[in-house]
């Protein structure tokens, strides 16, 4: 009896590595030492930072993965995986340096795995982050046929003096919301239930002319390069940042706001994108549930000094990033620290 007889095909794993090597190498940075296949991946941090603080992050894509598998759309879910991780470390002002992925399945399908890892490599390339390693685990009997799971891990760095931890946030600071590309990778357990119960036709088109399926599967926006450029040119104006993920607008921005302060968010400052309007209508989802489940069109938030907010907005315009002033920092009123109205 062989390992292949037991359900693990080492040759398929090796073939996958050869297939993805060119894609992975396109994401490499000069600091990457060596190639693929070592027991550990190497990254040279010397020379670039005076007092580097390493910032780590790990995440998955939730049950958006189920929808991707249901629809056979494997080429962009890897971008989602990268976005969920690198956008998180970006919040503290860190530049993502390198990324590792974990792909697990019951039986390895080389084409599917290559499409997924290709998306991861593309996401890393778009974020200036090197895909320096990963693990492909073929585990018979652990997953149903055709299913796989994903996890991502990233490490970034920021100068200690430039670390953003929310300590500078003051009452009166302005909230500048930057547009999301869609639901990103959060709320998909609810999204899938609404989608199934609505019985929407496969070719349903939303009010903005985008097919519903395309809107639901739009890759998570990658904010790294434009925000790092903004930090370099207008860093003194940014007191904190937030990545709007699980918990939506209600629970994410407040994570970077000091005790004693709260948020007053103006829900009329931007128009709810059609994909979220469809979800709310078809699912009969209450406003409060929308705010704490989805990003509702705001994927990333800058907490800015009011006197410099206009300059930040001009810089965002120059980078063609859609944005709105969505509220301000206020004194907290009792236990209610976030008001959306």
From Swiss-Prot:
Record EC number: 6.3.3.1
A Pfam family per the record: AIRS_C
Known catalytic reactions: 2-formamido-N(1)-(5-O-phospho-beta-D-ribosyl)acetamidine + ATP = 5-amino-1-(5-phospho-beta-D-ribosyl)imidazole + ADP + phosphate + H(+)
HAMAP family in UniProt: AIRS (MF_00741)
Gene Ontology terms: cellular component: cytosol
Pathway: Purine metabolism; IMP biosynthesis via de novo pathway; 5-amino-1-(5-phospho-D-ribosyl)imidazole from N(2)-formyl-N(1)-(5-phospho-D-ribosyl)glycinamide: step 2/2
GO BP term (any one): adenine biosynthetic process
Superkingdom in the source lineage: Bacteria
Residues making up the signal peptide according to the UniProt record: none
Family (UniProt): Belongs to the AIR synthase family.
InterPro entries the record matches: PurM-like_C_dom, PurM-like_C_sf, PurM-like_N, PurM-like_N_sf, PurM_cligase
Keywords per UniProt: ATP-binding, Cytoplasm, Ligase, Nucleotide-binding, Purine biosynthesis
GO molecular function: ATP binding; phosphoribosylamine-glycine ligase activity; phosphoribosylformylglycinamidine cyclo-ligase activity
Protein name: Phosphoribosylformylglycinamidine cyclo-ligase
Lineage: Bacteria, Pseudomonadati, Pseudomonadota, Gammaproteobacteria, Lysobacterales
Subcellular location: Cytoplasm
PANTHER family linked to this entry: TRIFUNCTIONAL PURINE BIOSYNTHETIC PROTEIN ADENOSINE-3, TRIFUNCTIONAL PURINE BIOSYNTHETIC PROTEIN ADENOSINE-3-RELATED
């Amino acid at each position: 009896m062989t390992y292949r007889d037991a359900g693990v095909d080492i040759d398929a794993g090796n073939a996958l590595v050869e297939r993805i090597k060119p894609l992975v190498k396109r994401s490499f940075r000069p600091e990457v030492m060596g190639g693929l296949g070592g027991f550990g991946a190497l990254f040279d941090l010397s020379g670039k930072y005076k007092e580097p603080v390493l910032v780590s992050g790990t995440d998955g894509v939730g049950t958006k993965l189920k929808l991707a598998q249901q629809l056979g759309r494997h080429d962009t879910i890897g971008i989602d995986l990268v976005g969920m991780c690198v956008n998180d470390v970006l919040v503290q002002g860190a530049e993502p340096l390198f990324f590792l992925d974990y792909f697990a399945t019951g039986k390895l399908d080389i084409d599917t795995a290559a499409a997924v890892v290709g998306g991861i490599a593309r996401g890393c390339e778009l974020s200036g982050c090197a895909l320096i390693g990963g693990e492909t685990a073929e585990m018979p009997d652990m997953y149903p046929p055709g299913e796989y799971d994903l996890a991502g891990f990233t490490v970034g760095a920021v100068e200690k003096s430039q670390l953003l931890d929310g300590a500078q946030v003051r009452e009166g600071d302005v909230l500048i919301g930057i547009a999301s590309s869609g639901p990103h990778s959060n709320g998909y357990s609810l999204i899938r239930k609404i989608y199934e119960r609505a019985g929407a036709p496969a070719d349903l088109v939303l009010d903005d002319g985008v097919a519903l399926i395309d809107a639901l599967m739009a890759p998570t926006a990658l904010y790294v390069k434009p925000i790092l450029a903004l930090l370099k040119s207008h860093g003194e104006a940014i007191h904190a940042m937030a990545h709007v993920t699980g918990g939506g607008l209600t629970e994410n921005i407040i994570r970077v706001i000091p005790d004693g302060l709260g948020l007053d968010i103006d829900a009329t400052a931007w128009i709810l994108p059609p994909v979220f309007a469809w979800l709310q209508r078809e699912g009969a989802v209450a406003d409060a549930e929308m705010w704490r489940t989805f990003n509702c069109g705001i994927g990333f938030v800058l907490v800015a000094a009011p006197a410099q907010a206009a300059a930040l907005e001009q810089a965002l315009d120059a980078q063609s990033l859609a944005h709105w002033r969505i509220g301000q920092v206020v004194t907290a009123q009792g236990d209610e620290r976030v008001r959306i109205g």
